Amino acid sequence: MDELYSVRMRAAQGGPHENGGHHISGAERIVTLNQVGFIAQSLAERALHHSKGTADFINITVDLIPSETITYIDCLKVKEHTANTVTEAHQLAVKLLQGTDISESAIRNSIFLLKSLVSSMRGAMLVDAISGERLDAGNRGVRVSHMDSFDSDKLGDNEHMREALVLASKVQSAEGIVGELCWSDDPDYTIGYVACNGVYHRIPNMKEIGSNLGGRVFFVKPNIDLEGVIEYLEKEPVLVQW
């Protein structure tokens, strides 16, 4: 098997994220050596031509991934839903997520947290699935990384959905995570999703068109090893099989 490399991009406007720059874009791939140059260029182009603005800070990182460290997981099943308004979409999200592992109050508090953002986070919030308490600190959140898919052409040209499915599949494979709530910070993209019980539920109208605020919430079981979960999400190489 050819050696694989992780190619990761993060971009901001107004300087680096660490210095208060406004997050524009982030993306990554796991590819063979002969694809690294092309993928790095395409990620840079994405940062320079984004609906949120033109990045003036772009960081691209390339790392070799030893094949023995890669975890292979199955992709979540996909279910499409309809919703005509943001209120209807959020009510559906509550209905789909609520169950023995996630309380209604935790879901509603998480929707409130996302709606209360004044700027988009690079990473996701970690929320106790029962109490609804936010467990992570600061504005960075947990940045899921080191992931990609096989046979991504099966989804056609829908890059938004491919990337979201890969990320959601990795998140749901983490021990102790029982659900996810997400809508994009892309002002032109209003489709969001919830993921739980092995299913990726795609929901339209999760936010108003033109809004550049979005984010993710990962619902975690009480009293889990948070450091272990974060280590897996941020550093464990994962390839998703369709």
From Swiss-Prot:
It is an enzyme of class 6 (ligase). InterPro entries: BioW. The keyword Repeat does not apply. Its cofactor is Mg(2+). Keywords: ATP-binding, Biotin biosynthesis, Ligase, Magnesium, Nucleotide-binding. GO terms for biological process: biotin biosynthetic process. One of its GO terms (molecular function) is ATP binding. Its EC number is 6.2.1.14. Disulfide bonds: none annotated. Pathway: Metabolic intermediate metabolism; pimeloyl-CoA biosynthesis; pimeloyl-CoA from pimelate: step 1/1. It catalyses: heptanedioate + ATP + CoA = 6-carboxyhexanoyl-CoA + AMP + diphosphate. Homodimer. Catalyzes the transformation of pimelate into pimeloyl-CoA with concomitant hydrolysis of ATP to AMP. HAMAP family: BioW (MF_00668). Belongs to the BioW family. This is 6-carboxyhexanoate--CoA ligase.
